[in-house]
Amino acid sequence: MYKGKKIYIDAVRREDLPQLMLWRNKPEYRKFFREYRELNIDMQQRWYESKVLNDNTTEMFAIRFNDTDELIGCCGLCYINWIYRNADLSLYIGWNESYIDEEGYAEEGCRLLFNFGFRELG
């Protein structure tokens, strides 16, 4: 877990999947994602099992409020290239219909993700 002033990032949990799927299926969000199709729960489960649990080129995190542990979004490093030491960053805030918010949660999430990447992955 990486903790900031307002939020922290930690492992995506199986029980997070229905909420993440609802946010991901919003058309105004989906247009920005690599996966542009509407997801069903089976697709979301497959993503969790293949990418979150079993892919060494992906590190995904849930974004949660420090004070309530409420899930507010998701972020991760995708397509990690271990040779060239780089990756794509993925992040969205679903809470409060934000996508990328003005309260600074996305910015703080990026900082926490960068800290993870540089400290844990090199």
Residue map of PLM features:
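Conserved acetyl-CoA-binding loop-helix of GNAT-fold acetyltransferases
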Residues: 101-116
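Amphipathic alpha-helical recognition patches that constitute DNA-binding helices
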Residues: 19, 88, 108
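A short, well-structured alpha-helix characteristic of acyl/acetyltransferase catalytic modules
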Residues: 1-46
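Short, polar/flexible loop-turn hinges at active-site or ligand-entry regions and domain interfaces
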Residues: 31-33, 97-100
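Residue-level detection of beta-strand scaffold positions
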Residues: 12, 16, 58-60, 71, ...
